C-alpha cells in the first residue's frame, strides 16, 4: 500500500484495523490530527475555537478521541515494514511528522529528501526508484 499526505495516515490506520498488506510506503504523511486541523483553520483564517469545536463534535459523535487516528498513534500497532519518505523542506507537513511516525513504528526505514516539498517528491526519480526497491525486497 502506498499513500501520500492524508493517505499515509489512512494507510497506517487501515493496517491497524487489519488491512492485510505486506509492506507500506507513506510519503509526506501528516501525523497529529489536531495539528492538521489547526493548520487548515489557520490557512483559512478562521477562529481557533473552530478547531476545538470540530474536535469536540467528532469525539462526541464517534465516541473516540481524535488523537486515536494520529499516524504516530496508529504506527504503534503496525508491525509490517514501512518506508517513510518525507522532504525536509515540506511546507505543508513538517518533517517532524516523519520522525515521530518513524519512532513509533517497529519495522521502518526513513528516507529524507531535500528541496522536493510536498508534491514534487511524488515524481522524483530517486524516490520512485527507492519505492520500487523497497517493494521488491
Question: Where in the sequence are the language-model features?
Answer:
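Short alpha-helix in the alpha/beta-hydrolase fold that links the catalytic acid
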Residues: 71, 80, 94-103
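Catalytic histidine-centered segment of alpha/beta-hydrolase-like enzymes
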Residues: 116-128
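Short beta-strand/loop motif that positions the catalytic acidic residue
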Residues: 77-79, 84-86, 90
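Gly/Ala-rich beta-loop-alpha elbow adjacent to hydrolase catalytic centers
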Residues: 3-7
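Hydrolase active-site cap/lid region
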Residues: 13-64
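C-terminal alpha-helix
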Residues: 130-137
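Catalytic histidine neighborhood in serine/cysteine hydrolases
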Residues: 102-119
